[in-house]
Every structure is written in C-alpha cells, then in structure tokens.
C-alpha cells in the first residue's frame, strides 16, 4: 500500500476538483502602442496578424470568429453592426479611422461579401477559420518577440486587454459589459476579476511586510 502511494505522486490527477478556469492575459496600453508601431513591411504575414490583433482591440475586443464573418453590408452610415456568434447579441460599433485604415490596407476581392480577408472562399468556412486562427496566433508569437512582450500573444489577448484597460480608466462595469457583448454585468465582473491580480498582489505584499 505504501509503495503504491509513493509511486502515485498525485492521487487526485484524474479527479475533477472544481470549476475549470481559463487563464486570461492582458497587456497594457503601452504594449499595444509598441505592437502598433512595429515596422513589419518586410513581413506581410506578421503584418496581417498584427493588424487583426489591433482590429480586435479597436472593436472592443471583437472575437476572431466574429471578425471572420463580418460582411461589407454590416458597415453602414459609419456604424459597424454584427451579431456575436457566441451569444447571439447584436452589437453596434462606431466606425473609426483606425478601423478604416486596416480595412483599406487588407481589402478583400471586389466580389467577396466579407469585410476582412480571413474567409476567402464561399465553402468550408469552418476549416478556413481554424487555419486562419492557427496561423494568426502563431504569427502573433513572433510579433510579441519583436515588440519585447513576454506573454504569449494571441487574438484573445486583444479582447482581454480592451477590458482590462477600460477598467483601469474607471469606465463603468455596465459600459464595459455592453461593449463586450456580455449577457450580464455579473459575467463582466467575473471576467475582469480573472484578468487583474494587481489588487490581490498588492494586498499580499502588505501582508508579507508585517
């Protein structure tokens, strides 16, 4: 019995002991600016990945799957409207110059219904999306290295960063919740709590000084 326990270093390895928690990472505004200011003109694949990251950030953390399915007709009279595929919630975003610059830089074919060149064919959208997501996240790792960012950069970091920066600027939870398309403010509170450990870290420092 003792031998069995000794060999099994983690007896709870296959036991579910709680609710899964996704690790969420955010970067500060100064890191976003570093990414934006990179000269990637000689690296078109990295340039595209960087611009998709920025587009997500500019559009209040729009998820990549929603970006992929944006249609040209979704942009009318200076307002971009789309329905979140995750929740079905309809969102409206004021179209800004920074968004237009990315759309102009990465124009789709004239006869393409899509606003961004993520889905390029009218068939097998799921496979196209998965491949584009993989390539973009892979290239973002290289972008992060060039920008001197230590955390693994992914498209979701853009969403997490928008929420974190909004919170740091004392934007009300209700506004952040609406901006991100959450179904409740409670969801946003949980989301933000998982992003920011600075308050807890600060409390721990005070305790350790006692």
Language-model segments: which ranges?
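Short, basic (Lys/Arg/His-rich) helix/loop patches that form interaction surfaces
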Residues: 37-44, 109, 137-178
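Short, polar N-cap/turn motifs at the start of nucleic acid-interacting alpha helices
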Residues: 73-81, 149-151, 171-190
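Short, contiguous acidic/charged loop-to-helix segments that flank catalytic cores in large enzymes
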Residues: 40-44, 81-94, 123-132, 151-157
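Catalytic-site neighborhood detector that most strongly recognizes the C-terminal catalytic loop/helix
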Residues: 18, 84-88, 180-205
